[in-house]
Amino acid sequence: MWSPRIVALCLLAAFGTQYALASAELPFGFPITAHFPFLLDSYENKREYVSYSIFRASSACPLPMTAAKNTSHSQSTILQKQQITSSSTASVTNLATLNSYQAVEDIKYFIQQQNKASGETNPKWIVYGGYYGGSLALWFRQQYPGLSVGAVASSAPALAALDFYRYQKNVEDAYQAYDQSCYNNLASAVTEVRHLIQSVKGRKKLSDTLRLSPAFDKLSLVESDFQFFYVVLLSFLQYPVQFNKVNWGPFSTSGGIADVCKLLKDNSVKDLDKVKNIVSYMIGLGGGDFSNSNLPNNYTQLVGWLADESNGGQMRNFLWQQCNELGFFTTTDYGSGGLFGSSIPNNFWINVCEDVFGKSFDVDNLKAGVKKSKSTYGASSTYTGKNAFIVRNMVDPWRTLGHITVSDPTSSIYNASGSAFTADLQPPSNNDVVSVKMARNLINRRIKQWISGSNNKRAYESNHIAEEKKTSKDMQGEIKASSWETEINWHEKLPTEFEKVPHPKTPYIPNIKKRHNLLDVFKHKMGDELYQKERVKVSEKAGSGFIRSGSIKQNVDHFDSKNNDVYRQFFMLNDQYDDGSQLVFLMIGGEAPIDPFFIGSEYIAMVQWGAEYGALLLELEHRFYGRSQPTEDLSVPNLKYLHSEQALADAAVFINKVNKDRNYTTPRWIAFGGSYPGSLSAWIRLKYPSLIYASIASSAPVQAKTDYFEYMQTVQNSTRAFGTKTCMSDVHKFFAWAQQQMTTVAGRNGMATLFGLCNKWDTDYIDPKDAEFFLGMFVYQIAGTVQYDDEGHSRLQKRCKWFEQVDQYLGAYTKQISFTGDDTEEHQQIVKQFSTGLQQMLWGSVRAGDEDDCFPFSYQIILDELRQDTPYYTDERCWIWQTCNELGVAQSTNFGYNIFESTLPVNHFMDLCYDVYGKDRDYVDAHVRATNADYGGQDYYNGTQVVFVNGSEDPWNPLSVYNPKDKSVSSFLIDGSSHCEDMFILGDYDTKAVKKAHRAIKKILKSWVSA
């Protein structure tokens, strides 16, 4: 009779028994199964699904036995193997219960049933596994600690991730760490491939050399074709790293980093042939023959195979889990420093999910699944369970998604240097590195401790780190004492119109990440004529002395007692309505100079309410914008002082000084702000509640997020909802045409001529960043229109008509030009005729024919502009720094099929962070996490007495607060309204939704004022 005292439960998690922990749990990737026959045999022929494997503690790991609920078993064999017959299909309906939550419950049920069957009163179960099985072991241990005494996990990606860009970067870093010259040769070979793929003759060379099937000239050459090519190619570089020196299959003695580097360092071989040799070597490693093989090069075939419910095998099953809860998609979304640029954005994998499982399996479904996973198992890199031993194999690219610290001293993490994917769980080998042997010894030691019940803390090597805490405590005590000892000047000269007037030859800088200026909102809303009239009125108020400017001495650093540098921060005030009640309305400045308009125009809601309630109106300029410059220049070392925490401390010191200077004893300050200043108004109430009584946060994106694809997703949704009937198709038609033109020299050159670019793009290779930023300019046009759309959506519909006209124009051009030879006079005349008309439509003038009047557009020009570190030169340098250093908000098109194609990968923005400031994606991600930990983000905002107001059309609304934690916090989403609409007074043109929200906001404001 089977009655074990100690049981080890190995979690193989739905993969073939033949390959135990390592083989079948490969990350999703078509190429590896296409070229390793022994894997393909497992997927296609055996069709054997194994959920869990039971091993006796004293055994030498016999073949595992499958466990399944409600399956009869004998005393001699716990559970028999269950073969999945060909009639069982992996349909979406059948896959509905394939998820980690069900798997954890299966483990629970299995253990309970075995305990019951064995009659043991004190069984000691140890759960262990590698890769996803390791994650299950850790999750089960967290969820049901009473059913096991410990867990062992190796190479366990326990943290769900929408975009696992770090996998590929870890691969590249591994080659560089092994041998710099190997890495340099790899970089050279990759560069050659990226150059060749841009031209017809280059693609033919790639097709012939790498035996692509089908060849590029047989494909329609849409973005997914190029992306899939790179997915295939990268797999041959990834697996030598993932399985480096792992005692499994062919990798036990070959196929590692050293073997690939040997091929790369053969300088007698040309770059492309080095790539071919690596592909040939890896295929041969799996028993194949490259000379008789064809490299798959057809995205349509891939998704067709995976969509076949009876054919996709385990890859279809695990893809299901990736698309629904785990993510784990390996991309090149790292930014500068990655060898493959933006070749595989997360867009590719989201499209795969939709194409394989259906349109409902989109980015929203994936995002919700990843969020649920993090909510269930934890989003922190700190493991909170007890009695767990986690092995991080430091060559394994998956290590980044594993836990790196523990919160309980009975758990430990061992960083196995030089070790790769689940190496410690494989049979011992002479090829094992020292750390693998050590890992096995430590595992044995831990298991003995768990079995003996020796849980004293001294028995463990602890990596204890406390969880990050969300805070809402008053921050006054953290500002250094000298900051409060300040001076204020109430009589500074008012500036003239401060906005920079660009020189006619200044290159176009895209409004990257949509730097906000409330003046732009007003101009769009009310029109230039009314705006100019209002400016005259505001100037008259300033002339009569109601509106004045002042300054306050502020510390450059409010938190470093060793830094005594100070600067002048400017503010403006309007005391026209001040009735002496000590009520103050503070308009917080943001990423633009302050302007008397915001405290002087009666079209601004705060001004109207200030007049009604007798408030003093103040406006405080944000450090590093306008005249408030803390440092001599905008160099990166100085930009560290440009931070929201420093800005909030500025405001706190300012409020305190005003209270003292005006002898306020019972002041009541209410903060206002829109967009980023809206976030500041919410955060200042969170951090300094004793100084700020309440806040109104308009269009406030309080959630920091690196890849903010929801921005462009909202632009698309708003275009669908409020644009013309054909707007979606017209916009998509333009970008599809533009992407197609970029695939050939003639197409690129034709576009450059049509649009009047100085660079004619007439070479086989162009910098992909030039094309990316050029097309991005058109994305920004429609995005900016949506962000600042009017209530009737006439601005958006006008922009839609513009795209419709451009499409018609380009269609006529393409039709006419197809009947002429490239070098004929007739051809040149048609190009000139159409380029003249098109440039009139785009720029309002003709910018071709004269070199001095062409359009100076390139990525390098943009970098040169943004690298200028002279104050007053550009607010863009400061704002983009804030996004790289705190906020993220990269407005990518990484949300699956969309009207913009894959025009703006997240690297579009990550490259700027690196190329302008030297900050890579790891830096950006870490600082985004810090921002959310500091302020709580949208889900854990703990402030009180705040009103959040957003418009459903506004692309920034997804980052605001909608489920407040405190009943004193209100949230309004105004249907059909866009950015900061609520900050203006009501007019006849306003919709019912806007009027209703305005009344509700004013009611809350009145309660604060009269309390």
Sequence positions of predicted segments:
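A catalytic-pocket lid/entrance helix-loop region that shapes and gates access to the active site
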Residues: 146-264, 690-808
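Short beta-to-alpha linker loops that shape the active-site pocket of alpha/beta-hydrolase fold enzymes
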Residues: 72, 77-81, 157, 419, ...
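Glycine-rich "HGGG/HGxG" loop immediately N-terminal to the catalytic nucleophile
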Residues: 81-93, 162, 624-637, 982
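Alpha/beta-hydrolase active-site loop
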Residues: 95-115, 639-659
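Catalytic-loop region of hydrolases
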Residues: 2-83, 90, 97, 420, ...
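C-terminal subdomain of alpha/beta-hydrolase-fold enzymes, centered on the catalytic histidine
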Residues: 226-477, 770-1011
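Glycine-rich nucleophile elbow surrounding the catalytic serine of serine-hydrolase chemistry
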Residues: 129-139, 673-683
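Alpha/beta-hydrolase fold nucleophile elbow
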Residues: 119-131, 664-675
